[in-house]
Amino acid sequence: MAVEESKSGRKVVPQRDTLWLSGADAVNLAFGIAIHVVLTRAFLSDDYGTFVLLLDFFHVCVILIDLGLPTLIGRDGERLGKGLKLVLHRISRIQFQAAVAAMLVFPVIGWFLFVKGGDWGWFEVAILLCFSAVVQVITYAHRTALRAVGEARLEAFVRIADRGTVAILMVGFASGELLGFAVATAVGPLVALALALYLY
């Protein structure tokens, strides 16, 4: 992987790593504002509220997929050395199984709780928004692994790739339909996951 080729004894340096991650957060804040501006202009207030409620609901629900496992990577990753990859694979396998279960259950619950009148047009949206939240949680383990081996700069790029992709696609769908915005929301985390898998 790219991180194996590029790192040569690179260590975790809290001050440096904090700067990289804080910079990524600042960039993503700008992307987040742009995303919300596009959504508020494109949707009626009810649709915007439902979209955000579903997204927030799924982000809360999929914390169950996290299972606290990435914390182990953050704590022990540097000490594990080459063994980190094996631990990461095991964690990813466990999270994938939890993710499959989540995708079967949470979209139905979210759609039932928050969509007025049982509009089936929102069911596809619920699936895509849940998928985006699930993928973000799975990506977190790989991002944490990058940070654990001293590559917070690469983690920063992964974070920006997620929100940046969503923002760019949102602008492209600015005059589009609800499903288009949901697709954009799902593609960003998928791009970030692909990048994280390539990097580690």
Question: What feature does the model see in each segment?
Answer:
Residues 123-130, 156-200:
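Hydrophobic alpha-helical transmembrane segments
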Residues 60, 64, 100, 104, ...:
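Alpha-helical transmembrane segments of multi-pass membrane proteins
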Residues 21, 25, 52-55, 95, ...:
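Residue-level recognition of transmembrane alpha-helices
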Residues 7-13, 43-47, 61-94, 147-153:
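Transmembrane-helix boundary and interhelical linker motifs in polytopic inner-membrane proteins
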Residues 33, 37, 41, 64-67, ...:
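Membrane-embedded alpha-helical segments of multi-pass transporters/permeases
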Residues 15-28, 85, 127, 131, ...:
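Alpha-helical transmembrane segments of multi-pass membrane transporters/permeases
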Residues 13-70, 107, 132:
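Signature of the first transmembrane helix
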Residues 1-3, 7-10, 70-73, 141-148, ...:
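C-terminal transmembrane helix end/exit motif
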